[in-house]
Amino acid sequence: MKKSIMTVLMILFISSVNFASEDLQVLDIYDYELVDNNIDPFFKAVIKGDLETVAKMIEDGSDVNLRIGGKTPLMYAARYNRADVIRLLVGKGAVVGAKDNQGNTAMKLAELANAKEAMEVLKEMS
């Protein structure tokens, strides 16, 4: 009986550890980000590079300079190399020189991610 209880407790503990680890992604030894499955739909469309949805959401009133976690949609578009989304956001008034909580601009985030297209577009639009 004791073995059965201990086995069940170990399985529950291991399951909860695996569940918790899904919410944290280690990008490298010095960087990490929390993965939020309840991410704002506008930011999700930006990250995916869904230009049509981003345009529609802006038309419906989404703020191109909204911040989540200190970052703007433009910063996410730059980090994920979404050149067309960058053009759209800047065309609709996104602030190119805005800084996140760590002092990074969209250009710096593109550089850190080696997002070459994003860097080119941001240079053109600055």
Predicted regions and their residues:
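Conserved ankyrin/ankyrin-like repeat signature
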Residues: E52-T53, D84-V85, E117-V121
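Conserved hydrophobic residue in the first alpha-helix
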Residues: F42, L74, A106-M107
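Ankyrin repeat boundary/linker residues
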Residues: V35, R67-I68, D100
